[in-house]
Amino acid sequence: FVKCNAMNIESLEYAQSVLHEKFGDIDVLINAAGGNQPKATVTDRLLVEDIKLVDWSDAFDLNLVGGALLPCQVFGRLMVEKGSGSIVNIASIAGHIPLSRVVAYSAAKAAVINFTQFLAREWASNGIRVNSITPGFFPAEQNRNLLFEEDGTPTPRAQQILDHTPLNRFGNANELVGAAVFLSSTMASGFVTGT
């Protein structure tokens, strides 16, 4: 592993250099940086029109800039030069359907989806496939209090989300591995781009 800050271009360039030197060509990039900005979440006391620009910016910096834009620029440059590669950006169902009140996160993930589709079209002639995985809701520390009561039962908000989830359950992070492997593999998904 090479530790880097996905929101810092110098850190990404260092990581790319170390990885390229150690392993040679970089064939696959999976961008998984992201998360919610609690100060950009609508509540009964915080309306969308009251969210500060800095909090919107924090959500976009983490999810779009660090979660797709900068890593794609840094690692994509090598892929363009060699004429092949696969990039997988982690998006969110929130980028398609605003099921909860995480407005800045949802907007930023929608931007990730659009950016993914743009790069897929832009880099297709260079032999680079760019896709996104759009997971549903996954319980994590950042949203556990919003989803579960102290006794472990779903909150009304969680139940509302589950009611709009075809499988009627929350996901597990390990369930994304197969999709990432599929989209990374030229043999399995060589004709798939822009998803």
Task: Give short role names for the model-derived ranges.
Residues 43-46, 125, 137-164:
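A glycine/serine/threonine-rich, flexible loop-to-helix segment
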Residues 64-65:
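Ankyrin-repeat alpha-helix packing hotspot
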Residues 92:
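Residue(s) in the substrate-gating loop at a strand-loop-helix junction
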Residues 39-48, 52-60, 161:
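Substrate-binding pocket helix/loop in short-chain dehydrogenase/reductase
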Residues 77, 121-125, 190:
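Alpha-helical segment proximal to the catalytic Tyr-Lys
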